[in-house]
Swiss-Prot record:
SUPFAM superfamilies: CbiD-like (SSF111342). Belongs to the CbiD family. The keyword S-adenosyl-L-methionine applies. This is Cobalt-precorrin-5B C(1)-methyltransferase. One of its GO terms (biological process) is anaerobic cobalamin biosynthetic process. Its EC number is 2.1.1.195. InterPro entries: CbiD, CbiD_sf. It comes from the Bacteria. Keywords: Cobalamin biosynthesis, Methyltransferase, S-adenosyl-L-methionine, Transferase. It catalyses: Co-precorrin-5B + S-adenosyl-L-methionine = Co-precorrin-6A + S-adenosyl-L-homocysteine. The keyword Transferase applies. Pathway: Cofactor biosynthesis; adenosylcobalamin biosynthesis; cob(II)yrinate a,c-diamide from sirohydrochlorin (anaerobic route): step 6/10.
Length: 372
């Protein structure tokens, strides 16, 4: 019997920055090169990092840690997280970003516009690391900390940072200190952050898509909307819709393809391939309602995939089916959130042909739907 492999956890950029800061400040105080740094993470565990480098010149000290994403590496896996510390002329811990750390240019993020994209928990971890070292050596001095990531501007192109208005590099992130492999919580958090940025930048209409290809087609369908209005929800349809309503976003357009939206139409709001099977009986009933022949309805009932059903309907010229499917998606979405939104659904082929579209309103929303 095959033994299931235990996935290895990684560490956040925020924890790496705090560890590098602790080592750099220790080197500045002691005048000794450090080889490692031990730090307590937010969830209570203690972790020791081996340093990639450590140096000092009397006025400043620098230490670095290689970011290890564990068995769920992201774009920042392998990046060098560098902390440079120096004594400040004023009390307190003064944190800024250097090369390769982004700067916030749009509202809606947990860091104010104009500041380095170092999130609140990493800032707290850096503060605690500095204060721990100062207390250890009985010092009461202000400290400057600059976090940098060589190559961070290039790495950031593989992330959502440009869309979120974080320019010039990556973000220093993390709430727990560790990276849990294939964590759905992390993906959900990224959806919430993207929606908050959209709302803060005045978007009353957002477009949520199941992936990069559907987002490309969505941008072609809604060219009048700003980039931050487009959000990849992945499989988290219900979660994303509820967050839209919570944030007071009035118009939500869903754009995707047959496979996942066939599930949404059934009321399945987590559309991972393993979450729930496609109900071919449901699709057959829609086909019958759309005027398909009895033979075609039977073929739909016996189909293997939703994409196959889509091909059958296209070949038969039964395009009413797709309109009904989009209507069912809108109804399921409104039911999921308890109404109060305007919801549009567009279904595309893999090659970008729009198969169907529907718009439904539930509530007294006054949304300009001319571009829907």
């Amino acid at each position: 019997m095959e033994t299931k492999k235990t996935l290895r956890e990684g560490y956040t950029t925020g924890l790496c920055a705090a560890a590098a800061t602790k080592a750099a400040l220790t080197a500045l105080i002691t005048g000794q090169v450090q080889t490692d740094a031990t730090i307590r993470i937010p969830i209570g565990r203690v972790v020791t990092f081996s340093l990639a480098s450590c140096s000092f010149d009397g006025e400043t000290a620098t230490a670095s840690v290689v970011k290890d994403g564990g068995d769920d590496p992201d774009a920042t896996h392998g990046a060098l997280i560098v902390s440079t510390v120096s004594w400040a002329s004023s009390p307190g811990v003064h944190i800024d970003g250097g090369e390769g750390v982004g700067r916030v240019t749009k509202p809606g993020l947990p860091v104010p516009v104009g500041e380095a994209a170092i999130n609140p928990v990493p800032r707290q971890m850096i503060h605690e690391a500095v204060n721990e070292v100062l207390a250890q050596y009985g010092l009461h001095r202000g400290v400057n900390v600059v976090i940098s990531v060589p190559g961070g501007e290039e790495i950031a192109k593989k992330t959502l940072n440009p869309r979120l208005g974080i320019m010039g590099g990556i973000s220093i992130l993390g709430t727990r200190g560790i990276v849990v492999p294939f964590s759905t919580a992390a993906y959900r958090a990224s959806i919430v952050q993207a929606l908050q940025v959209a709302k803060a930048n005045g978007c009353r209409h957002v477009v949520i898509t199941t992936g990069g290809r559907s987002e490309k087609y969505a941008m072609q369908e809604y060219p009048h909307l700003p980039e931050e209005a487009f959000i990849e929800m992945g499989d988290f349809v219900g979660f994303t819709l509820k967050q839209c309503k919570r944030l007071g976003i009035k118009m939500v357009s869903m754009v995707g393809m047959m496979g996942k939206f066939s599930k949404v139409a059934q009321g399945v709001m987590m559309v991972h391939s393993k979450s729930a099977p496609v109900d071919f009986g449901f699709l057959a009933a829609l086909a019958e309602q759309a005027g398909a022949s009895s033979a075609l309805v039977a073929a739909v009932r016996g189909a293997n995939t939703a994409a196959q059903v889509g091909d059958m309907m296209q070949e038969a010229g039964c395009m009413k089916f797709f309109e009904l499917l989009c209507e069912a998606c809108c109804q399921a979405a409104l039911h999921e959130v308890g109404g109060g939104l305007t919801v549009a659904t567009s279904i595309y082929t893999m090659n970008g042909q729009q198969l169907g579209k529907a718009v439904q309103t539930d509530g007294d929303d006054e949304v300009d739907r001319c571009g829907c």
